[in-house]
Structures are given as C-alpha cells and as structure tokens.
Design a protein with these regions (language model features):
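Short glycine-enriched loops at secondary-structure junctions
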Residues: 50-55, 104
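Short, well-ordered alpha-helical microsegments
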Residues: 56-60, 83
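Divalent-metal-activated hydrolytic enzyme cores
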Residues: 1-44, 68-70, 77-95, 106-379
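Short, acidic Gly/Pro/Ser/Thr-rich loop/turn segments
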Residues: 54-57, 311-312
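Short Gly/aromatic-enriched secondary-structure transition segments
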Residues: 61-68
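Active-site neighborhood of phospho(di)ester-bond hydrolases with catalytic His/Asp-centered motifs
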Residues: 97-103
Length: 379
C-alpha cells in the first residue's frame, strides 16, 4: 500500500487515536447508521475480521446483541481479513456489514500501549497485545537496538567520526538492518571516507549534513557516544526473506516490513504497528470487495478500526474496549458507492443515536432456546 518513499510520519499521524469511542457506543451507532442507509432490520449479516484473542470477545458479543446475529468470521490472527470468505459471507444475508480491526492493549496506570492483563491466569500476568504483532516486530526491534548500541559518534581533532560495527557493514547478509550509509558517511568521489579499520568495526568521517541533524554535544563529543535514539527511520531499511503468500502466515509481517523503521523508532511501537496494519488492511480489502461478485447488488458497509483493549479491573469480566474508526466503504444495492475518511465516518457515527431500540435481549434469547422443545436428530 505504502511506497518506500512515503512520508510515514504524516501517514501515521493522519490516523488520529483521539477519535475513539467505547464499543458499547460504537456498535449501536454503527447499527443505526446501517439502518439510516436502508439496511433492513433482521436481514443484516455482520462479519468481523478480528484477531483471535479472547479480549476481542466482548466486541463480538455487542455486535451479536445489536445486529441480532452472531457475526460471520472474516478474520485471521492479527486482524488480517480473509478475503476468500467474501463469497460465503455474501450468501448468508441480504445486507452486509464487515468490521475489520487490529488491536492493541493499553495500561491506564502507566499510560502505555501494548500490554493486557490475563485475568484467567493464576497470577493475572500481563502479556504483549496484540501478541501476533508483538511477535512480528520483536526481531526488528532487536536488530534496531543492536544498531543503536553499536554505532558510535565522536570527534578526533577537527574530524567528526562515526564508528560502525562490521556486522552492520556486511552487505552480503540475507536479512537484517541495512544502513543508508550515504546519509551518514562523508563520500569522496563515490567512496566512503574510511579513517581506519578496527578488530570488529570501522571508523569513518561523518557527513556534514548528518552532523547538522545531531545535537552539538553528540557529534562533537571527544568520547565516543552511542548513536541511540538519533538513529532515525530515514537512516536504515530492513531486508528479510518473507513468504509472499497472500493472507498466509507472514501476511501481517508483509503489511509492516516497509514501515518497520517508523515502527521501531516510535515511542509506542505496538500502537503504530496496529495503526499501520489497519490502514493497509482497509485499502487491500476494499479493493477485493468491489470485485467480489457476491456483494454486487447488495447494501454493504465495510469499516476498519483500531480496537484498544483496557484490561478488566477487579470484579469485571470483560475489557473496556474502545474503537477508533479509520475509514469506511459504503455500497448501495443500486450500485452506487463511496468511501468515508476518518473524520467523515466518525462524524456520521456521532450523528447516530447510541440507543438501539431493535437490539435483542441476549438473556431472553438464550432462555428461549433453553425452553424450546427438543428436536430428535435421526441418523
């Protein structure tokens, strides 16, 4: 979706997390929006493309309660949309709704993203959330931390120097973090200005342009200083052989790899990764929906969101999940269609009532099935 030269800082900041609402408000508003678009009560087949994490269960319950049907499963681990399920989903209802969401945990005490407390464990321990996203980005974080701690800036006489570990200079590697050396090292006649080779590293002359981007106390330090946080996202790329099978095991990683420099250098890597995955999945899925013949001639609403999971407090069974809508695609049965950007879909949702007079009574519906006369199955 994003080119390697895209302004990722702008792209990520365009996804405003402050445009959030509780799921208990989001779902009835979404239902009422569908009804305002001509969707018929009792004939709407919702579908969700959520991660398989148990903390996504509460949103699913709310979808069932307000739409009157348990949502079809359109999702894979990590919030990836299984687009090969469009056809069966289209056969299950008159009007169609698809809700895609990546998710990330949030700790209100530390005001940080990426973790969730598991109440069903003996010690209520906290784990990375989304676990799939955490697993995917960890290798990239490790590579970044190695580079941060093995590139040194200093000064020898009047010469500003940069010392780089030999591993980072090995261009024959099949995978790893690769530096944009032309932005960091002084080049003369197309050659890197090498001062000396050490046992495990090399010392170069820093480019004047790069030096200008650094604080004076870093670039001019007489004692070598780790580059640390000054290794910005424009100074490196990642390479890694990944299976390109669409919607396969590595699909989430494929969504993120080009944006990894911005993810690992951000203050909240898990949040940024979840936002980017939501953005990529909306763009990708939208293009498959418009080509899916099963959806032609149907009312359809597809929305992509970021789910923020706040761990349940003592005495609570479910998380306080908040939804951050990103974008929506709306199609009418007459063939007309349009997309809504974040501010537009949020505005449309906020115009809807948070009360749904057509929601089902879950307890009554369950009791009805408990009380129903048994049916003998003949084999």
């Amino acid at each position: 979706m994003f080119s390697i030269n895209a302004n990722m800082k702008s792209i990520v900041s365009d996804f405003r997390v402050d445009q959030m609402m509780r799921y208990s408000l989001f779902v009835p508003r979404l239902y009422n929006l569908c009804r305002s678009l001509g969707f018929e009560s009792g004939n709407i087949m919702p579908s969700r493309a959520f991660c398989s994490d148990e903390n996504q269960g509460f949103p699913i319950i709310l979808i069932a309660k307000h739409f009157g049907a348990f949502p079809f499963n359109h999702g894979q681990v990590g919030g990836i949309v299984a687009t090969d399920r469009h056809a069966p989903h289209a056969q299950h209802g008159k009007d169609m709704v698809i809700i895609q969401a990546s998710h990330v945990g949030y700790n209100p005490e530390t005001e940080t993203f990426g973790h969730y407390t598991r109440r069903q464990t003996l010690d209520n321990h906290t784990t990375t959330t989304c676990g799939k996203i955490g697993d995917v980005i960890q290798w990239y974080l490790d590579e970044y931390h190695f580079a941060q701690n093995n590139i040194f800036l200093g000064q020898e006489g009047d010469i500003h120097t940069i010392t780089i570990d030999n591993q980072l200079m090995d261009g024959t590697r099949s995978e790893g973090l690769f530096l944009n050396l032309e932005k960091m090292i002084l080049m003369k006649n197309g050659q890197q200005s090498l001062l000396r080779s050490l046992s495990t590293s090399r010392v170069y002359v820093v480019s004047e342009e790069f030096c200008k981007t650094l604080p004076d106390d870093i670039c001019s330090a007489r004692q070598s200083t780790c580059i640390g946080k000054h290794l910005g996202p424009d100074l490196f790329v990642y390479q890694r052989p990944i299976s390109s099978h669409n919607e396969g095991y590595n699909h989430l990683e494929l969504n993120l790899i080009k944006q990894m420099p911005w993810i690992v250098t951000s203050h909240e890597p898990m949040l940024v990764a979840a936002k980017i995955n939501t953005q990529v999945e909306f763009d990708r899925t939208f293009r498959t929906i418009v080509k899916a013949q099963g959806y032609w001639g149907k009312n359809l609403l597809f929305i992509s969101c970021l789910n923020i999971d706040i761990s349940p407090q003592e005495g609570q069974l479910f998380p306080l999940t908040k939804c951050v809508p990103w974008a929506a695609y709306i199609q009418s049965s007459d063939g007309s269609s349009y997309t809504l950007e974040q501010s537009e879909i949020v505005e449309r949702l906020m115009q809807q009532s948070s009360e749904n007079t057509e929601q089902i009574d879950m307890e009554a519906a369950i009791q009805q099935m408990i009380d129903a006369q048994g049916i003998k199955i003949i084999v």
